[in-house]
Amino acid sequence: MRKTIVIVGASRGIGKELVKILSRDENNSIVALARNTASLAEFNHLANVEIHAFDLNTDAVRTSAETIFQHVSNIDILINNAGKLVNKPFLELSKEDLEESYQVNVIGVMETVQAAIPKMLEVGGHIVNISSMGGFQGTVKFAGLAAYSTSKAAVASFTELLAEEYKDTKIKVNCLCLGSAQTEMLEEAFPGFQAPVSANQMAVYIADFSLNAHQWMHGRIIPVSLTTP
């Protein structure tokens, strides 16, 4: 059965690996959303991948997403993978740092979901929100990541609330809190650190989870980590 899979934050790291992995199945129709679409040029020749410019750091996220989604009959899977990381001491965080972190990591995610839900209600779908171990309660926290980690904690809370609101529908919602994977974002947070898991390895797990986990779980906040970092 053909599946329409929307991947937000597809231009690099885990998101780009997800496009590679999920597009190998010709029955998957991939909608890749990214602020920087140039890095996705290698997928232009694939008939089952469509690429759209999409910026979460704007006031028009919901309307932009609705415009993109109007071209698909339904959405089977939405993977909210995009993220903004600011690594600064707490007292050096500007209001702009805080607003952008929450706009990209929380508000933009919620508005994207608002646009996607009408495309899921009839046949059902799986929303996978990507959070971080930094936002998972009770784990080790790191100085300099106050804006990032608190916003990712909000993503986990949003997942639980959304799951409750839509528990009587065909929509399933889950959240993966990722530990260290070798990505550009990890390098920004912990320069020089070598993660035990590659972006591709993490993407393989997320792809399988996105395709299958909705069959037996809903509203789950799941740590996916060997190290933090």
Q: What residue spans do the PLM features occupy?
A:
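Conserved NAD(P)H cofactor-binding loop of Rossmann-fold oxidoreductase domains
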Residues: N81-V86
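Active-site-adjacent segment of SDR/Rossmann-fold oxidoreductases
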Residues: V140, L161-I171
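N-terminal Rossmann NAD(P)H-binding glycine-rich loop of SDR-like oxidoreductase domains
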Residues: S11, V19
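Active-site helix of classical SDR
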Residues: V113, Y148-S151
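Residue(s) in the substrate-gating loop at a strand-loop-helix junction
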Residues: S132
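Substrate-binding pocket helix/loop in short-chain dehydrogenase/reductase
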Residues: P89-F90, D97-E99
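C-terminal helical subdomain
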Residues: D168, C175-L176, P191-P229
